[in-house]
Amino acid sequence: MLKKIVLASVASATLLTTSLTHAAADTPFHNASYDIARELFGEINPLFVEHWKQQSGKEVKIIQSFAGSSRQAQDIIQGKKVDVVTFNQVSDVDILAKRGLLRDDWAKQFPNNASPYYSTTAFLVREGNPKNIKGWDDLIRDDVKLVFPNPKTSGNARYSYLGAWLFANEKFNGDQEKVKAFVGKVLKNVENFPTGGRGATVAFAQNGQGDVLLTFESEVINIANGDEFKSANLQIVVPEVSVLAEFPVAIVDKVADERGTREQAKAFLEFQYSKDIQQLLTRYNYRVHHPEVVEATKAQFAPVRLINPNEVLGSWDDITAKHFDNGGILDQLLAEGR
């Protein structure tokens, strides 16, 4: 009788352990990323799954979604359950912190202001550069039509807007009326305002809209050198001066703690700082921080003087309130351009 009880207890304990292990293995975490990161995380995610299994002995599943980072942030605020964010706009993470979804000091939780990699705004032009586009000044010409995403929904496009603003701010020695007029002309020349970066790429490279696509340097190089639009023979233009675009990452604490995914989520974001992933990021033409990788890829990137928007325009709260909130300068300039 005692033997039967012991065996039954062992069987129950084994079943419980198996169930708990299975539950832990099957608990997925959700990464919400920006619109043009599909191919990048299509590589990173399976590499992390393998890495996690080697480190922990457990399986992990990653649920992945893509959209303009501002749209992603709004969806999360409205109840979308996401464990980590890998965005292209710091303010889109800040707004989640303000809503109590993650900690206020999220940018201190990982190196380099929680930005494993960075980029800048560059231009893509038609074969032979028929409009002779060299820099920001060319974007206000009457004969030039532009394509970039809507800054109201896309972090990518906010950097395009800020790149134009920061260039004009230097050009006109801070004369705000002249700066506004310059950026207003840029916006007036926009032929198509898709909600996200991928839509802008398709509009320009596939549908033939516009003379210049403004997007991240990484995307510009990927489009020009990739197979998808190879027949179009598109060309890269990197202006001499442009905006520093940091790509922030964060754990959505409220969700990760509720679902018990913090350990996996933290490891996933730390993984992006590893040498192997930093090398992978440069293959997608992102600029990175790992010293050995930076040295090995110096020739890959065009020289450009990067302006940190926070050093000129203040905090992201200030920038968002002044430029991108409803009724801000962006809305004013768009209304004037209609």
Can you say where each PLM-predicted feature lies in the sequence?
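Bacterial N-terminal signal peptides that target proteins for export
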Residues: M1-S9
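A conserved helix-loop-strand patch within extracytoplasmic ligand-binding domains
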Residues: A97-E170
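Ligand-binding pocket segment of bilobal, Venus flytrap-like solute-binding proteins
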Residues: F172-P239
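N-terminal signal peptide c-region/cleavage motif recognized by signal peptidases
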Residues: T18-L20
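Early extracytoplasmic/lumenal segment of secretory-pathway proteins
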Residues: A23-R99, Q109-F110
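Extracellular/periplasmic juxtamembrane helices and adjacent flexible linkers that interface
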Residues: A256-R338
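Alpha-to-beta junction loops
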Residues: G79-V85, D143-K145, N207-T215
